[in-house]
Design a protein with these regions (language model features):
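Small/polar loops that bind or transfer phosphate-bearing groups
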Residues: 17-18, 104, 136, 162-163, ...
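Short, acidic/turn-prone active-site loops that include or flank metal/cofactor-
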Residues: 20-21, 45-48, 72-73, 138, ...
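Short gly/pro/ser/thr-enriched loop/turn and capping motifs at secondary-structure boundaries
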Residues: 47-50, 75, 139-142, 190-191
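Class I SAM-dependent methyltransferase SAM-binding "motif I" and its flanking Rossmann-like core
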Residues: 3, 107-177
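Class I S-adenosyl-L-methionine
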Residues: 1-23, 28-131
Length: 211
């Protein structure tokens, strides 16, 4: 309508990877984005619970930051998690549509098996005019390879990365096709994985790293 005042330009949503846990593995860009934005969002597994992402970035969080604790229960069922993704996206969108930049802090890398992927999908679908930027982070398996001096790939090696919770049958198929297999979320199927590795004679070549 002519003469009607336009609303503020939307803020930018940043997905900020913080790395695997060591604050010294945060990138300079991650630190700069955190310093620049007024709103920070951190994932928690329940209201008031400790946030691992917040702990990594604690030295960069200021008293004047608006801090959003977004609840994502430790569940795997998408139907259970979807309302939490929607609420998180809505809480962020309220700030973004008011013109405030916001950073979603993620352990590891934002686009590698992270909660940010779901929030990103929701916001870009519902608010396609909101700018989004992603700051990559060091993934846990890269840090694990470095800590154990285990090269992941060389020359023509084939590498697969997948959650072990896909099932031992899937893992066995992947082991047949790839030179290096990185398994995430192994604890729920640890016994079955150990049996598989023993059966295939791969136990001497396996490395387990825990946080």
């Amino acid at each position: 309508v002519e003469g009607e005042k336009a609303g503020p330009a939307p803020g930018t949503l940043y997905g900020v990877g913080l790395g695997p846990g060591d604050p010294e593995l945060m990138t300079l860009k991650a630190a700069r984005v955190i310093a620049r934005v007024p709103v920070l969002a951190v994932p928690v597994k329940s209201p008031g619970a400790e946030s691992f992402a917040r702990g990594i970035a604690r030295d960069h969080i200021r008293a004047d930051h608006t801090l959003l604790e977004l609840v994502f229960p430790m569940r795997s069922d998408p139907e259970v998690l979807r309302p939490h993704w929607e609420r998180a996206a809505g809480a962020l969108a309220a700030h973004l549509l008011a013109g405030r930049d916001a950073a979603f802090l993620c352990e590891g890398d934002p686009f590698t098996y992270g909660t940010f992927v779901h929030v990103f999908t929701q916001i870009t679908r519902d608010h396609p005019h909101v700018p989004v930027r992603v700051v990559p982070g060091v993934s846990a398996y890269h840090a694990a390879a470095a800590a154990t001096l285990t090269p992941l790939a060389d020359t023509d090696d084939r590498v697969a990365v997948l959650p072990a919770t896909y099932g031992v049958e899937v893992v066995e198929q992947v082991l047949e096709r790839f030179d290096t297999v990185v398994l995430l979320k192994v604890k729920p199927v640890m016994d079955a994985l150990l049996d598989l590795l023993e059966r295939k004679g791969l136990t001497p070549h396996a490395v387990f790293v825990n946080r």
